């Protein structure tokens, strides 16, 4: 029983450390003309969003809440 409690505490601590120092990558939503966002269908990895993000000058993007999100996209580059 003590091993289970100790294991649980260790897992929780590593989870907290991961959320504190996790990969909180900056980014932005790329915009079309007239400030519309690029929509996408399935959340997660998306070839469409990667292509959109490459048009905006960054290497990687994915679908988040049915909208493309580009990692490391700066505010000045959000519009084409």
Curated annotation (Swiss-Prot):
Disulfide bonds join 40-63, 49-68, 53-70. SUPFAM superfamilies: Scorpion toxin-like. Keywords: Disulfide bond, Ion channel impairing toxin, Neurotoxin, Secreted, Signal, Toxin. Expressed by the venom gland. Pfam families: Toxin_3 (PF00537). Residues 1-22 form the signal peptide. It is found in: Secreted. InterPro entries: LCN-type_CS_alpha_beta_dom, Scorpion_toxin-like_sf, Scorpion_toxinL/defensin. Belongs to the long (3 C-C) scorpion toxin superfamily. This is Toxin-like peptide AaF1CA1. It comes from Androctonus australis.
């Amino acid at each position: 029983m003590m091993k289970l409690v100790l294991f649980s505490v260790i897992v929780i601590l590593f989870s907290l450390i991961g959320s504190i120092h996790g990969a909180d990558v900056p980014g932005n939503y790329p915009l079309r003309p007239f400030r519309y966002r690029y929509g996408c269908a399935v959340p997660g990895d998306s070839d469409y969003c990667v292509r959109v993000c490459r048009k905006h000058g960054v290497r990687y993007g994915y679908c988040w809440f049915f909208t493309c999100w580009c990692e490391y996209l700066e505010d000045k580059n959000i519009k084409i």
